[in-house]
């Protein structure tokens, strides 16, 4: 029978190494589903064997993309990661848990596509963009303003804004730009980049802003962190509409769902589309 303590230690070491490759080197060695399986197994073992608590665990963190070359800034509100799922059954269970937590409320869900990019937090003070910060370790991240400010379509000022506003989103690279850059590198005999997400992650951490500008990045905004004064928004759908009013690049397609799907024929499928 496997030793749970040894398996926990092994999984923590494996996940920590994969976090380093993904967040700091932008060169993941395994795909997202394989990584999620490792993390799910570790979470299961930690829940079953709390006596083997060795301190910090990768199940309790969001990785860390900070590097020494950049100045770090503390997020006014932590940037947390979202749980994910690959099955409709887990999605239904999620809805059931929320129904038990809020038995007297009729819950409406906002459903939107997920862009596989690099998380970023934009800080606006009195309507002016003052800083762009990477997720980092969720508490503080790297100041990447010089590489984010030039992104086409990103407003450097917004009207009728709260005194302090953190806007959260994803920086990504379209497939056409990725293929253009890799084509040029191939012609020069240089190593090719693995995928658009890795190239976007590497681009925002370039020390030469001119080189970063030569690579076309895109950005999509979908959420709000700190907002001072508070109580500015009461629902995610309001955030979506206000971001659009402020001329932020947003996902135009999203849906409001009255409850989680309980039965569907054919079965619910989770799919993606190419950008």
Task: Report the location of each language-model feature.
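RNA/tRNA-interacting regions in translation and RNA-turnover enzymes
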Residues: 1-275
């Amino acid at each position: 029978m496997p030793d749970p303590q040894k398996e926990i230690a092994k999984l923590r070491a494996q996940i920590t190494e994969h976090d380093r490759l993904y967040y700091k080197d932008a060169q993941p060695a395994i795909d997202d589903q394989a990584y999620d399986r490792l993390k799910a197994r570790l979470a299961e073992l930690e829940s079953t064997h709390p006596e083997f608590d060795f301190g910090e665990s990768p199940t309790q963190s969001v990785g860390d993309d900070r590097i020494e070359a950049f100045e770090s800034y503390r997020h006014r509100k932590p940037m947390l990661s979202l749980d994910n799922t690959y099955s409709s059954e887990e999605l239904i269970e999620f809805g059931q848990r929320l129904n038990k937590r809020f038995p007297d409320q009729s819950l409406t869900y906002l459903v939107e596509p997920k862009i596989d990019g690099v998380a970023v937090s934009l800080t606006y003070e009195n309507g002016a963009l003052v800083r762009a910060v990477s997720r980092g370790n969720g508490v503080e991240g790297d100041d990447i303003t010089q590489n984010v400010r030039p992104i086409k379509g990103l407003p450097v000022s917004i009207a009728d804004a709260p005194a302090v506003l953190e806007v959260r989103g994803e920086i990504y690279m379209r497939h056409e730009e990725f293929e253009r850059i890799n084509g040029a590198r191939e012609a020069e005999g240089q190593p090719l980049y693995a995928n658009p997400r890795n190239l976007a992650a590497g681009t925002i951490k370039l020390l030469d802003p001119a080189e970063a500008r030569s690579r076309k990045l895109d950005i999509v905004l979908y959420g709000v962190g700190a907002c001072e004064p508070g109580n500015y928004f009461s629902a995610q759908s309001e955030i979506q509409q206000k971001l659009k009013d402020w001329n932020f690049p947003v996902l135009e397609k999203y849906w409001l769902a009255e409850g989680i799907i309980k039965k569907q024929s054919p079965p619910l499928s989770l799919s993606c589309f190419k950008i």
